[in-house]
Amino acid sequence: LPATGEETIHRRLFLKWGRVAAAVFIGAVCLVSVLWIAPGNRHTGLNLVIQENREASTLVTTLEDGSIVYLGQQSTLKYPEHFAADKREVNLRGEAFFDVTRKHEQTFLIETEKVRIEVLGTAFNVRSNEKGLFCLSVRRGRVRVSMKQGGHSVLVDAGKTVTLQEERLQLSDTRESGESGRYTRNIRFKDECLEDILRVVNAEAPTLQIQAASSVLNKRKLTIEFENNSPETVA
């Protein structure tokens, strides 16, 4: 690649993520069928970024704070170009995994139809849809889940799952489903900096850390797709 220029490079690579698919999601969040929450007045005056994924592959986006979003098929993500000083709030329609960067001074907020999720930096899976289904499983750290009506809230620790039953939040032990692997079998980056792409790829293979040849190259933006090959193939 040339070492200068800002133009987007379009490529398609094929990677085999199967045997290492779970690794990246040790620090991931899954949001499935989350209802669209309109930005409303909370984002007034802020420039909103809209990411839409209409393809079968997972669209991977890195937010301003370093959090990584794996956006599922037929899903849309809205977020401010610059987060507020005290919170990081995103709006999702569809499904996604989130790998949230820990920042105690900036709570990461996710809203669904009936509950609000507060994150400081942790790993968990969430399901929520228009029929009232809600399920959240924590893999690492702790998450607070609060009902929008009634004020009922619970703290969910690693290895625990919270579900919504008869308008009450219920805790239980987590059952591993291996669902996250389907999000990494075919992933795509759109206009992402090379350094952000390499951060995701390197997370898949901790023993093989790929680095760009220069800081200028790190800032080059790429559109690239990985499917059914190992991270070692990238190197």
Give the predicted meaning of each segment:
Residues 5-20, 24-235:
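A residue-level detector for the "anchor" residue at the start of short, highly conserved motifs
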Residues 1-3:
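A short, acidic loop/turn at secondary-structure junctions
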